[in-house]
């Protein structure tokens, strides 16, 4: 049995819809992350046993096994196997879990968990457009994302002002993190076509090395935004995650094999979880996933130094906080998807990457990463810095 550890983790910058990364095909985005994590670790890519890639909208340019074709696009060894998975927004976090599982099982001594979403080119939901009809006997009350976010706000008694305050917090923390250089180590800059008038074509290229989604906002500006779902709703564009392009990759190895190769293990995966949540609330799964992953590690909220709770909507994080009552100074310390963006198939691996680098920067010991996912699912991971 292997002892899985994280040896390296990288991510691309995150681009806005139609923005800096819109001219890159998903194979190029993900292939860049895959190749970068291998090259930065300094391992022979032929020693990677398997690749697990998360992607949500698996159609169009993201159809036909994007994880495998990204690997080949990057010029990496053809003999390495790959699996592309759909666990909705939890896809690449679950990809890292699967990479760790096969290392633990002794199937491989090295594996990559990664993910991509090129939402400018493959819009969310385009794989079921025009709307795929539900069965005539469908009786499950599972709302869309915005309706779910509003239901969660109702459930916890969260008001518009609280949500706006959290949206402002995300922007301010992310801006400060960039100013302090906190993301520099995890980012792998990418050469991308400069978008043309059609937003996905260009003849010039530019090196993209920074997240595009940050906004200089204020309480007044957020308060002036109209709710997405009309009068009476609470969530606005300022308290929801952004439509984005990006990729991330995490290299998992057996600890003994890594040390024998002269590589430095950087974190252990103490526990992982994938849970189903109550469909009526759809996106409230991080509450249950956190409880399960803590139980699996034999830990409590007080044992965790850093939390990364994906900011799909402000109410998702605040609902989670209402139940688990963490020290909020430990939660999303460098901002989250409201400010940085949410390339859905890549975000899980991005959160693990950011958590690893922040553990090292701050000298902290443990991190818990969790996120909601479509289909009333949620993933969670606990890392321990080595």
Predicted feature descriptions by range:
Residues 11-12, 23, 31-32, 165-260, ...:
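N-terminal extracellular/periplasmic Venus flytrap/periplasmic-binding protein-like
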Residues 1-24, 219-284, 288, 295, ...:
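Condensing-enzyme catalytic core mediating Claisen C-C bond formation in acyl metabolism
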Residues 49, 150, 186, 270-339:
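Active-site pocket-lining segment
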Residues 22-110, 116-132, 187-208, 280, ...:
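Conserved beta-ketoacyl condensing-enzyme motif
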Residues 85-116, 153-183, 249-256, 343-364, ...:
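Active-site-proximal alpha-helical scaffold in enzymes
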Residues 24, 55-109, 140-147, 216-242, ...:
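Conserved catalytic cysteine-centered active-site region
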Residues 26-42, 66-70, 95, 145-152, ...:
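Short, well-ordered amphipathic alpha-helical segments that serve as non-catalytic structural scaffolds
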